[in-house]
């Protein structure tokens, strides 16, 4: 069974209750919950929250496959990692594979998730993460303030059309098995492929 896990804290310090702020007429979290509920490979969507207001908001969506569950104060604290919430979930729920979905990715679609699960099904794949290809020239700055390019030779600057670019993790979703999550204590491990 494939489970989607969407952790949604009520205690954001930067933007209080950001996950239910309106984006295009719907609460922010609506867009990822809807995408997960429409994914053909996801059997159940768990939204884990410590907030009664978020719980009610998500329940009001009345979307198929969606269940709102509690989240401990410890796993919803300012210092808790997302992995701690995933591991807490894994201890209490039965599933084979998990897709962690960040509520703050409203442009995520069911088709994105479908592609992720298709990649995950390949024999040599242990985990999948969502990524975007970038075609930017990066620089780092040392302690003296001197800038140095990190991904190209400044004297042989490639044409953009000839530049291979690089992948950037975008944080929208991560897929792994329950067994690998428990073994590695991490959202991805083993042979990791991008989507």
How should each PLM-predicted stretch be described?
Residues 1-16:
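N-terminal nucleotide-binding beta1-loop-alpha1 segment
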Residues 78-85, 106-193:
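Conserved core of the sugar-phosphate nucleotidyltransferase
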């Amino acid at each position: 069974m494939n489970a989607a896990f969407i952790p949604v804290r009520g205690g954001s310090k930067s933007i209080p209750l950001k996950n239910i702020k309106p984006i295009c007429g719907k609460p922010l979290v609506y867009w990822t919950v809807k995408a997960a509920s429409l994914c053909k490979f996801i059997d159940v969507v768990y939204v884990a929250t410590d907030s009664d207001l978020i719980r009610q908001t998500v329940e009001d969506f009345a979307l198929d496959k969606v269940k709102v569950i509690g989240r401990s104060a410890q796993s919803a604290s300012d210092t808790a990692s997302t992995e701690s919430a995933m591991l807490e979930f894994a201890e209490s729920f039965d599933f084979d594979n998990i897709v962690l979905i960040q509520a703050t990715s409203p442009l995520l679609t069911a088709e994105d998730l479908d592609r992720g699960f298709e990649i995950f099904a390949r024999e040599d794949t242990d985990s999948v993460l969502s990524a975007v290809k970038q075609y930017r020239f990066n620089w780092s700055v040392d302690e003296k303030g001197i800038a140095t390019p990190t991904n190209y030779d400044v004297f042989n600057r490639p044409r953009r059309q000839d530049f291979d670019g690089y992948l950037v993790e975008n944080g929208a979703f991560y897929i792994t098995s329950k067994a690998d999550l428990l073994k590695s204590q991490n959202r991805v491990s083993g042979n990791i492929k991008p989507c």
